[in-house]
């Protein structure tokens, strides 16, 4: 009975897409009425805070680049679709671990972008963290708050109102999954906040310190969430629909720090429009690697084509005082391996 309840719940659950991702495609000229799929609260916040929307748009480009970096050696490589308001296409309709990662990294990207814009004085509604004033102390002793501490609390609060608005309104199984992974994303940024200090005193003796709180490079957040993706936990809804139960009883329960997902991923080997898979035909692979970037894994056993190409690289670089590095340009001939396309009959079965 419990299994049947979960199955019906998942089948009938409407799919939730994050239409606000499209803000990144619109760029600086964000027109709220042109973003499809926003709920009323999101549209109102969009109209009220055009400067924050611009920051979110710039941030979207950054987190998409980070997603593509993290999955550059993966069959699914975080590809985006032009002129598609879902940005990633039908692949996001499946409640898979890839979807879990995208929700987490996108939310982290919004938090990061808004917090940075605050510190740079680009937003009317916030600036540096007002709580970081006066004196404080750490394990090295006392210090004075100074400089401009990143206002991470504001960077988290606005996305909770804007990004989470659609999921909070729907309150279905997929929405709960999205909210959980959103939380993982925003807490990942906060996890890597650093205390940075400048020493004052004779010859830098550090008798006095001025310190401020600053976000780490976004790559740290991306690396952390990729590790969470690797350890993501498959879940089902619990019987009262208020939370999650682990799908496999041999695995530990999901915590607030874990990414969660409902459905297994497709293999992403061949183009499959219904699953949103672009396939791996034509993808560059590593002939000798046994990892996910290796030709055997990337090409799904179909084999690969080898093309000899000549490219220009910098070589014989030397440092010249002061202060430049000068390089020669050298020709280099290398073999590039790309995955073969599937046989036509195999491809037709997936379309």
UniProtKB/Swiss-Prot annotation:
The entry's keywords: Developmental protein, Disulfide bond, Extracellular matrix, Glycoprotein, Lipoprotein, Secreted, Signal, Wnt signaling pathway
Lipid attachment in record (O-palmitoleoyl serine): 203
Recorded GO MF terms: cytokine activity; frizzled binding
Subcellular location: Secreted, Extracellular space, Extracellular matrix; Secreted
Biological processes, Gene Ontology terms: animal organ development; canonical Wnt signaling pathway; cell fate commitment; neuron differentiation
Glycosylation sites noted in the Swiss-Prot or TrEMBL record: 77
Residues in the signal sequence: 1-16
UniProt main location, coarse: secreted
CDD domains documented for this protein: Wnt_Wnt2b
Disulphide bonds in the chain: 67-78, 118-126, 128-148, 197-211, 199-206, 269-300, 285-295, 299-339, 315-330, 317-327, 322-323
UniProt keyword annotation of Ribonucleoprotein present: no
GO CC terms of this entry: extracellular space
Domain of life per record: Eukaryota
PTM comment, free text: Palmitoleoylation is required for efficient binding to frizzled receptors. Depalmitoleoylation leads to Wnt signaling pathway inhibition.
Main function: Ligand for members of the frizzled family of seven transmembrane receptors. Functions in the canonical Wnt/beta-catenin signaling pathway.
Family statement drawn from the similarity comment of this UniProt entry: Belongs to the Wnt family.
Name assigned to this protein: Protein Wnt-2b-A
Annotated source species: Xenopus laevis (African clawed frog)
